[in-house]
Design a protein with these regions (language model features):
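Karyopherin-beta/Importin-beta family HEAT-repeat alpha-solenoid scaffold
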Residues: 1-301
Length: 301
């Protein structure tokens, strides 16, 4: 990834289509913060609020918007409303400008999202963590199983980070959202690549041994999976932990159990039946019905 001493990506500048390097345009960040204050202040006039809103929308189309979005979103000292807007700058670039980016530019944007994902904190508001995870999904729909082949490994690495389970919750959001948007047929971006994306989803969720037994003559094609177990097995192992006696009263683990069951429900319609059986998904969903937490029971039913 190309960059300058300020950490600002310079990819594609020579072609006039990149994130230009002007030292980060230091005057823009305080103007963004001022505009956000005007929008959210109850004391702002309607005219001031409308002008500030128009300015914030206009910034999204600027070539440097993704860089400023990454800079602000990375700064945990910023107010959540500022960081949420910063993520929206990245979201706009991914959704509406992705096809115009060169390979190095797209890689830079993806690396920024990966860095934000790794650096989420338990104290970050849930809506910020989910917004970041949605950015991951948006990039996956556009490039996973094409020029982005190590996504599964990156998810596993996040899953295995020690300490808080915040990264596990992040991965669960990515898995559920990706499953929903690839297989429900309503997302137009995913629909354009549904063949590659659906095959990749089956690949990473299913234990490798089940794939080999179910399709002994299958052509592996593009390698997208990391390790042999697959996500159905990992989800089951964590669900057992969440419902175990040592974790049953932990609010974080209760919430995690709900998210795991939500992923189960999303993947059951398309997962290979033998994989569902091998990973004991149905048995674990039945076990959740006996949980002491009503929210877990409801999702598991």
């Amino acid at each position: 990834m190309n960059g300058s001493t300020s950490g600002h990506s310079t990819v594609g500048v020579e072609a006039g289509t990149g994130y230009q390097n002007d030292g980060g345009n230091t005057t823009l960040l305080p103007r963004i913060q001022q505009a956000l204050e005007l929008v959210h202040s109850p004391y702002s006039s309607n005219e001031s609020r409308q002008e500030a809103s128009a300015y914030l929308e206009e910034i999204k189309t600027d070539d440097e918007a993704p860089y400023h979005g990454f800079t602000l979103a990375s700064d945990h000292s910023q107010q959540p409303v500022v960081r949420h807007y910063a993520l929206s700058l990245l979201e706009f670039a991914i959704r509406y400008k992705w096809v115009g980016y060169s390979g190095p530019q797209a890689t830079t944007l993806r690396e920024w999202v990966l860095q934000l994902s790794k650096n989420i904190l338990p104290e970050d508001p849930l809506y910020l963590r989910n917004k970041t995870a949605q950015l991951w999904v948006e990039i996956a729909k556009r490039s996973w199983a094409d020029d982005w082949l190590d996504m599964d490994e990156l998810l596993v690495r996040l899953w295995e980070l020690q300490g808080s389970i915040v990264h596990k919750e992040f991965v669960l959001f990515v898995l559920e959202t990706l499953s929903d948007e690839v297989f429900n047929g309503e997302d137009t971006v995913a629909a354009l690549r549904v063949g590659a994306l659906s095959k990749a989803c089956v690949e990473i969720f299913t234990p490798a041994i089940v794939l080999s037994e179910a399709f002994p003559n299958r052509h592996v094609g593009t390698a997208v999976r990391f390790r042999e177990d697959g996500w159905l097995v990992r989800l089951g192992e964590l669900l057992d932990q969440c419902l175990g006696p040592d974790s049953a009263q932990n609010l974080q683990y209760k919430a995690c159990a709900v998210k795991i069951l939500a992923v189960y429900k999303s993947v059951m319609p398309w997962a290979i039946p033998r994989a569902i059986s091998s990973a004991s998904c149905v048995q674990r969903m039945c076990t959740s019905l006996a949980a002491s937490t009503v929210s877990v029971q409801l999702v598991g039913s």
